Amino acid sequence: PPGLPPLLDKHFMGLCGDFIHRHHEHTGHLPGAERLTRFLGGISVPLFTKLKARGIPGFAALEDYPYAEVREWAQAHLNDL
């Protein structure tokens, strides 16, 4: 199979914006890089059930990418918020 396109080509807020907004509404704070990585990788945790994360655009959008690579990408973008 062909290689995955670089994460640099991905639009952070396009993939995570709705999740970040819903997470902030529910918890009162922004999600961290680990939580965003789980969302983008399609890894369910109990909070995601409450947030109905599977129905949020972007859920599992980066599931084919290595976890550590997605976490670094998410952390870099969180630092810019």
List PLM regions with ranges.
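Accessory DNA-binding and partner-docking regions appended to nucleic-acid-acting proteins
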Residues: 1-81
